[in-house]
A protein has these predicted regions:
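Beta-lactam-recognizing serine transpeptidase/beta-lactamase-like catalytic domain environment
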Residues: 1-164
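Periplasmic/cell-envelope proteins involved in peptidoglycan metabolism and beta-lactam response
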Residues: 112, 167-182
Length: 182
């Protein structure tokens, strides 16, 4: 889908993988985690931008290119056909990440004069039992979580989709969000 070989390979775990790798069955919680981009899902920033583009265009996708001039793709793909109401709810939820009073990137609201839909994220570098040994104030800078955000806009007719990863940025809303909306 992009002129980089490895960008076509997305690791999406499934029950048989988990059983072989961890000797545990698949739990409903694994599905919930996958739905919000957590758990065992592995993707690159370019793949995240592709997901944002697909959501912005309500399931429609054209190939990406790193070429200097925009090349119109002849290959258009349409993913899972959600209802218009489903797409509205998805877009509304992502807009509320910034525009909502409890959104994880609500502090970005004042930084712009347009509406953006977003999903913030964090890639943990210290996990499980090791994480409990550290407080964020004592954690070495190189071990702080990576900050992520995917976004598209301006709403309601998005023209741009982005993904931003800030190494050791700690929080998607405060670490990666300002980069995405600038």
């Amino acid at each position: 889908c992009i002129d980089c070989f490895e960008e076509d390979k997305v690791f999406v775990p499934e029950p048989s993988w988990k059983m072989n790798k961890h000797n545990f069955g698949w739990f409903k919680g694994d599905t919930v985690n996958m739905g919000v981009g957590q758990g065992y899902l592995v993707s690159t920033p370019i793949q995240l931008a592709k997901y944002a583009y697909i959501m912005a265009n309500k399931g429609k996708f054209s190939d990406l290119s790193l070429k200097k001039d925009l090349v119109k793709s002849e290959k258009n793909i349409e993913f899972n056909k959600f209802s218009n109401d489903d797409w509205f709810k998805l877009h509304e939820s992502m807009v509320n990440v910034i525009e909502g009073n409890t959104g994880t990137a609500r502090r970005l609201r004042e930084r712009k004069n347009y509406i953006v839909a977003a999903k913030t994220g964090t890639a943990e570098l210290v996990s499980g039992d090791n994480r409990e040994q550290y407080s964020d104030t004592r954690l070495d800078d190189s071990l702080r979580d990576h900050a992520l955000i995917i976004a598209f806009g301006p709403m309601p007719n998005p023209r741009y989709a982005v993904s931003v990863v800030v190494e050791n940025g700690e929080s998607g809303g405060s670490g990666a969000g300002p980069v995405a909306t600038s």
